[in-house]
Every structure is written in C-alpha cells, then in structure tokens.
C-alpha cells in the first residue's frame, strides 16, 4: 500500500538510468498489402516472408509449428494482432546506427516482398 508521496517519487527515481547507459531504439510497424489486389496479405504470405528473411540471418520464433516472428542480434520482428509486422530494433548508441538499422531492415523487406 502506498502511504506517502515519497514512495511514488522513489519508485520513479529507481528507474532513472545514468547518462552513460542511455540508448536509442526504433520500432517500425508495417501493414503489408498485395500489389495485385490491394488487399492486406494473410498469414500464409507472412509465413513465406518470414521464411525468406531467414536467408538474411534472422532466426525463427516459433509457436508450435508456426513462425510468429524472427530475431537477429538485439532485433526482433514480430507478428502483431492485426496481422501487421513490427521491427523492434536493437539498443543503439546514436541516430546514425538507427538510420543504418532501418535501411538494412527495409532493404531486406523489399528483397523478400518483391518475390511474393
């Protein structure tokens, strides 16, 4: 039970990181559409896309026998409830690393989605 304002303040203070430990990270959420009919792609296409991304060094995240995401280093690509995918990027030191990570991710996505 909270009995004082100081308890709340101390709780938030306990989560403060030192400046030397600051990092940045990116998240990209993508809704994917079929260019032939402009409809959202279904799980079977996402499964194909995830399988193709394995060639870029991604590792599968499985639920039973279904691939529901990928990881590589500190990055994850996950299947979200609306059938969209989301990249959760690595913890990086500066914006230039985040830019490079985004460019690499988008390059890989373009390579595999053009073949679907």
Indicate where each model-derived feature is located:
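Terminal catalytic/cofactor-binding subdomain
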Residues: 1-116
């Amino acid at each position: 039970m909270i009995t004082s304002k100081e308890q709340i303040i101390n709780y938030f203070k306990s989560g403060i990181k030192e400046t030397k430990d600051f990092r940045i990270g990116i998240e990209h959420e993508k809704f994917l559409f079929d260019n032939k009919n402009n409809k959202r792609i279904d799980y079977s296409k996402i499964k194909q896309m995830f399988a193709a991304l394995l060639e870029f060094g991604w590792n599968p995240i499985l639920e039973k026998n279904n691939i529901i995401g990928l990881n590589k280093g500190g990055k994850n690509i996950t299947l979200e409830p609306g059938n969209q995918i989301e990249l959760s990027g690595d913890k990086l030191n500066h914006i230039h690393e985040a830019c490079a990570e985004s460019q690499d991710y988008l390059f890989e996505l373009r390579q595999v989605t053009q073949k679907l």
